[in-house]
Every structure is written in C-alpha cells, then in structure tokens.
C-alpha cells in the first residue's frame, strides 16, 4: 500500500542524528518525513545525560552555527555547565553540560513539531525500495510504502541489536525497544561492507540510597557558560551538583571474580567496544596496575531519583553489578533501578560513503550516526545535519557540500571515516584535528554560519544576530588598531600599574592587548581605554584574534599549502591497476578505499608522496585533473 504523498527527503530514526537530519532538510525547504518507531522517544538520551566535552563540544557548536537544535536544547535542559580545559589555550577549551533527560527530550520534540516542511510518522521501517541503484522509498512494518528520491538512515544501535547482561542476551535496539531485524537483513543485501560493534551503559542508581557526604562535590562553573550562540543564561533550568567517588581493590576483586560470566571475556560478544569509553571490567583487565578508577555521580534530571554513575559501564551479571556498586564509597547501601548492559549492533564501513555521507553503491541513500561506526550524541548529530543537508541539496539538483579538515571538526570527522574507516566506535577529540587553533568552539559561527546561510540552514533571526556580532568585532578591532598611547600621554598613569614593564614608545591599544599580562576585560576597565564590547562572545573573539594573530596566520599559511591538491578529484570508476608506476600494495589500497580526492588518497595508510605524484601525472596525461566542490 502506497502512502498518498511523496516526500523530497525521508529520515529513518529519531535519535540525535535523525532529528538533526530531518530539521536540516526541512529548514532548506525540502518536504521531509521523519519515520520513528516511537514518537515519545524522539530526542532520547539513550546513554549518559550529558552533551559536549573535549572535541564533542566543538561539534555541538558547529551544529549550532549551522542552525541545528542540539545546543539550543542543551541550554534549556542543562542542569550543570562547565568549561573544560579552562586554564589551557582556546583551541582545546570545551563546554560540557549535564542535561535533564526529560527536559532535553521535550525541547527537541517541541522544535521538531514546530518545524515547517517536516512531517513525523510513527512506524518502524523494514525495507528500502531500490531501482537501478537509486533509492526510491521505504516500506514500513505494516507494509506502507513511502516514496522519496533521498533517504537518510540513522538507525543507532537498532540494526540486529543484541543486549547482553552476563551470559544472558536478547534482541533489542536499546533497553525497552525492539531491534530492527528486517531492515538489517535488507541492508546486508547491499554491496556495502558490514561489521559488528558494541557499546554499553552503567546501572542506574537510586539517589535516595547514596551517601553523598562520603563523596567529593563537583559544582558547575560561575559565571555559567551557554552552549548555543543564540543561548542565554536565562534559558538554563535550576543548576545542581555532581559528585566524584572511586572504585577500590575490593571492587576490582568482585569484578575479576565475575569475569567468567562476562559476555566480553567469555567470547559471547563479538563486536568491538569504544576504546575511550571502556567498560569497568575492561578497565580492570587493561589497567591491572591501577588500584582505583574515578566515577562521576551524575543526576539524570531535576525530577527523578535516577543517578548515572559515569565510569562503571558494565555487562556483568546483575548480582555482580550489585556487589561492585555496593563496594564503592558512598554506595554501600545503593539500590540499582536499571541494570547496566552491553549492546551489539551492525554498522557499515564508512569508506563506502562519499564525504556527503551518501553511499557510493546506492544513489540517494545516506547514512548518519552509529550506523557509520561512530559513538556519541554529538558525532551523530553532526553527521545527521550533514546528511540531511546533502539529501536536500541532491533533491534540489545542487552539488553536495562537506567542510574541509581545516574548516570544521565535522570535516575532520567525515574525512577520517570516509578515508580511513574504523574498526571500533569512533569518537571525536581535539587531537584528531591538525589545524585545531583555527577550529575553536568560540569561532564556530564565524567559520560556518555564512555558509549555513548560503545553504539555507540559517534562519533570519540567527543571521541578524550573527551579522551584528561580526560587525561589532570588526569595528572594535579597527578601534584598537587605530587608537594609540605614547609615554607622555595622560592615560599612562592609569595604564602603567597594570603592565609588567612601562611602555617606552608609542603603542596601539591592540599592541597593549597583545601583552601577556593584559586581557581585554582588564584593558577596558582602565580609564580612557573603554568602554569596550558588552557582548562577551564578541569580546572573546577580539581578545583571541589579537593575542593569537601570529599563530593563526602561520597555521593559515600551512593550510594554503596543503589544500593546493586537496580537492583534486579522483574518478570513482578509476581502476588503479591502469596507473603505471604504482606498487601492488598501493593499487590494492586505492581500489579498496576508492578515495574521492587526492587529499583523501594521501591520508590512507601506506600511500606515499611518490604514489600521489604518480597519480597526479596520470590524471594530467588523461585530462582528468579536476577540482571537486
């Protein structure tokens, strides 16, 4: 049975990738359908109740700069905000928010339900309709067919999902939700490489059974940060504390004693887990010399007693879980409200994707989120936005777009996945970006909002606020460069007490700000130098642009050299056996990866600069040299 309407874009799945994908396509004017197995769980935080962190916060800011919903929802749901690495340079500073699960879900659902061009329908998808390597629609579990030339799959952990607690296991997409078996079987028929990954979650604890007096309190920052460039502290709900405790030798003994019933260590789980978010049993095994591990005690919301003990993700049997929890200081009498578990699921090799996140095998079929081998809400949301945007561009007959590695962490994420693939759940870190001085949280809007406006992702309100901010930054920089103070100036008496060494020659306000002992706020408080900018975001930009101008310029020069051949396109139909001079190893790797550009090819392990030179010569001889968009 066919549904009576045809859609421009269909998004399957309503998690963090699916919601951003659907919103992006709809914002760009595409008639969009979001299909979910349960409308009530749209925007659900399935694992930890937090958004942001090192690398991840950068992605959230980029989603926000492109008009996405994640940062806005976090500002309305965040019950504790902190700036991580605040004592370090601006490139690695990151915002992290503890979020109220219910408030976050409610805000996302409110944004979805009020988005023009977006229809939401509750049905699980069992099948894809593909004709001549082109997707033309989907079929739901009740046999209802929806037609569309572009489909974005954001299936999370649902594809052939299997939940493990001890040696017991059962099929599930996550606790309380059914898996997507039929769709997983259909996808395995496609010419896309498939694998298995696993992730896990800790047991949830009843706050009424925890003795917080034995733990270290961790308060949020003051003044409070905001996540969205459109955000305001007034959006934040009540702020509360988290706590810190630790495992001990007794905890470790209990865990070691239960490893014979661990699905990870008995061979029941085949999927590979996240390296940077290991289970507690994995920590004990891998770091046997450590006598304790830190645990963050995180409230799940303002109106619930559930506590998320971040650091003890586990799939051990329930009796072992209860014993290990009660061995931890402050949790001697703790009661578990939900057991921890591991979940195995299908993912597809992201090397089989274009950097638009469209599959190379099926036109119009896009993948985003954990289906591509990533882990984390932020990584999923960023991919979802990109996939939804490119699905809309394709329907409009326009070229796909993806930021380069020097333009966004989103560009780093997609390039890493589509070029190198992944054998384990991929998460973002600032260390993955070679140009991180330019890819800061604070300038995500300056990097991306103009492009977002051009693409149709950014609305009038965001554009007006951004334009005003940009103008104020430029005017203030001009003022600082154009105003000078000399040793005999009346301003000197107020200025010199704030300087390590008094000025001996005429200096601009910009030069004074560049001094290590000076910051923008301090300079503006000195009589004759203010009043300065009231907008803290704009003021921060002025300070960073002045103080780091030399470093930023040098990094930009590096980028200009690197991008010369970065976007030189490689035909996907090119058989590298036909390129004379390449080694058998290089031929095999290039034919296996099928890179889209010279830049992608150069980042494949084992591809030498000499091989790249041979490729460029071959392309030139054949008249195939072209720059991709």
From Swiss-Prot:
One of its GO terms (molecular function) is flavin adenine dinucleotide binding. Pfam families: GIDA, GIDA_C_1st, SAM_GIDA_C. NAD(+) binds at residues 273-287. Its cofactor is FAD. Keywords: Cytoplasm, FAD, Flavoprotein, NAD, tRNA processing. FAD binds at residues 13-18. GO terms for biological process: tRNA methylation; tRNA wobble uridine modification. Belongs to the MnmG family. Homodimer. Heterotetramer of two MnmE and two MnmG subunits. NCBIfam families: mnmG_gidA. This is tRNA uridine 5-carboxymethylaminomethyl modification enzyme MnmG.
